[in-house]
Amino acid sequence: MDTVCIAVVGAGVIGLSTAACISQLVPGCTVTVISDRFTPDTTSNVAAGMLIPHTCADTPVPTQKRWFRETFEHLSEIAKSAEAADAGVHLVSGWQIFRSVPAEEVPFWADVVLGFRKMTEAELKRFPQYVFGQAFTTLKCETSAYLPWLERRIKGSGGLLLTRRIEDLWELQPSFDIVVNCSGLGSRRLVGDPMISPVRGQVLQARAPWVKHFIRDGGGLTYVYPGMSYVTLGGTRQKGDWNRSPDAELSREIFSRCCTLEPSLHRAYDIKEKVGLRPSRPGVRLQKEILVRGQQTLPVVHNYGHGSGGISVHWGSALEATRLVMECIHTLRTPASLSKL
């Protein structure tokens, strides 16, 4: 076998980062990203893009930490390069605050972010309803810039982007030797996974250029995340809700909650409503599988189900998916071991 043809299904941050990793690290292959929706119309485009991990119950914490560290290191390199503005990656400092002292005062990711420490009493005075807080510097990844940047990287490596709705992974055989499934919620239909479901997130994007520090309620529902062009105000976490239309009443509630944390937001302007459906699953599905139909076989690498935490671990999980793709290629080139895939 000479050139290996690889299809990546899905063009959110998981799909594009996986395609970019494969293009960068796997010699002798062609990569085609296939999706019915590309930026700016993906769920990832609604994401605030803050690197603060969301614990995934069925994914081992050491694995989550490794993915987060690899992602943080990857974006840190971009943030200190000439590419930072084009990629939409920058450092941001702020506070995560709690109404009661959390069971885990020092989270598993504390030594990955920069300058993690307990907030001082003077800092907490700014938030009178809160009794405990954490201060740190992390990274923000503006998906409106980062996704197009990843697309350019993929095309620059000879990859292709194809707008097409896939109804069945077998459609891609025999044109492609390996399929990487990064279809997020689409995996419910595409591979019949009943464990993946939507968690609806509604946010506001507002102009408030004077807001420089992030503020996040420890419960994760209310947050103020300043970015390069706008501040993201959140949010909601509505399990099983497929509605992509903004709810005006929810928007008012979100704005009110965020103004309680940062009263200067009352002066925010050019406010837009955004809705995304997070691909939630008890644990990320990152594994290889060989589909069999009659005498035909199709190697598949699954990489989906990151829920609210996709941005925070995208590069780490893309690296792991790439390692699995390499294993599939090795197997394809040694047919006698196909049954061991």
Swiss-Prot record:
GO terms for molecular function, please? D-aspartate oxidase activity; D-glutamate oxidase activity; FAD binding
Q: In which tissues is it expressed?
A: Expressed in the small intestine (at protein level). Expressed in the ependymal cell layer of the telencephalic ventricles, hippocampus, thalamus, cerebellum, midbrain region, pons, olfactory bulbs, and cortex. Repressed in the testis.
Q: Which GO terms describe its cellular component?
A: cytosol; peroxisomal matrix
Q: Which GO terms describe its biological process?
A: aspartate metabolic process; D-amino acid catabolic process; grooming behavior; hormone metabolic process; insemination; nervous system process; regulation of cell communication
| Oxidoreductase listed as a keyword | yes
Give the induction note: Expression is not affected by chronic treatment with olanzapine or haloperidol.
Q: Which residue pairs form cystines in this protein?
A: none
- The UniProt annotation places FAD binding at 36-37, 43-44, 50, 307, 311-312
Q: How sensitive is activity to pH?
A: Optimum pH is 8.3-11.
- Phenotype of the disrupted gene, per the record: Knockout mice exhibit deficits in sensorimotor gating, motor coordination, a decline in fast glutamatergic transmission and a decay of hippocampal long-term potentiation; the effect on sensorimotor gating is enhanced following administration of the psychoactive drug phencyclidine (PCP). They also exhibit dysfunctional melanocortin-dependent behaviors, including diminished autogrooming, diminished sexual behavior, a failure to ejaculate, and an increase in body-weight. Knockout animals exhibit a reduced occurrence of psychotomimetic behaviors following administration of phencyclidine.
* Cofactors required: FAD
Mutagenesis or variant effect for residue 237 to A: Resistance to thiolactomycin
| Quaternary data | Dimer or tetramer. Interacts with PEX5; the interaction is direct and required for localization of DDO to the peroxisome.
What is the recorded name of this protein?
A: D-aspartate oxidase
According to its UniProt entry, this protein's organism is: Mus musculus
What lineage is on file?
Eukaryota, Metazoa, Chordata, Craniata, Vertebrata
